[in-house]
């Protein structure tokens, strides 16, 4: 695991973690993604909350759905939903993030998260938007060798290459998007991290 940071301002940064999952974990995730790609193509489950522009047009062109909805009350059946807990219980990562900025401690104190899978085929994209999250953690996977689909932060002129097993963590209020995929299938796993209070 290699952790680096890109400063967007004096107050916050983007964390980039390469080789986050082990070879074994990555294999388990890839196997499940191959099955879930069919679910995405059949649109059995779909993301009903993608970002829209002021005219109500979708900013997203890709197949996506919340994994939590597919495995409702059966999370133990999903390798992905179990393996991605690593984000919250990896002490080495926690130490490095908090050493950079105490604000990252929200990741480990938050009590609610959801996992969205985005399957980007050729010509798919996600125009710049903001998330209603405290933090968003994006992890990139490859179902087929892909080109394009880099993560962009247009207000800060930052572009991060989308590569297998790379995690990018950033505050949800930062404008971000995915460039068009020009070849293959690129998958992103978005973990939306928040606080939840029952009313």
Functional labels for PLM-detected ranges:
Residues 1-105:
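Non-heme Fe(II)/2-oxoglutarate
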Residues 90-199:
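Catalytic core of non-heme Fe(II) oxygenases with the double-stranded beta-helix
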């Amino acid at each position: 695991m290699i952790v680096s940071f890109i400063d967007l301002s004096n107050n916050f940064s983007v964390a980039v973690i390469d080789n986050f999952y082990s070879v074994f974990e990555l294999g388990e995730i890839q196997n499940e993604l191959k099955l879930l790609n069919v679910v995405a193509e059949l649109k059995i489950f779909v993301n009903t909350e993608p970002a829209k522009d002021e005219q109500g047009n979708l900013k997203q062109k890709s197949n996506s759905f919340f994994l939590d909805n597919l495995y409702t009350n059966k999370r133990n059946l999903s390798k992905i939903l179990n393996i991605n807990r690593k984000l919250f219980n990896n002490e080495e990562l926690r130490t490095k993030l908090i050493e950079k900025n105490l604000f990252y401690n929200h990741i480990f104190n938050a009590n609610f998260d959801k996992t969205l899978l985005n399957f980007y085929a050729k010509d798919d994209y996600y125009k710049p938007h903001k998330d209603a999250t405290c933090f968003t953690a994006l992890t990139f996977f490859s179902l087929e060798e892909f080109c394009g689909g880099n993560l962009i932060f247009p207000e800060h002129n930052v572009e991060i290459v989308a590569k297998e097993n790379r995690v990018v963590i950033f505050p949800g209020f930062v404008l971000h998007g995915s460039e068009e995929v020009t070849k293959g299938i690129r998958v992103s796993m978005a973990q939306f991290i928040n606080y939840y209070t029952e009313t």
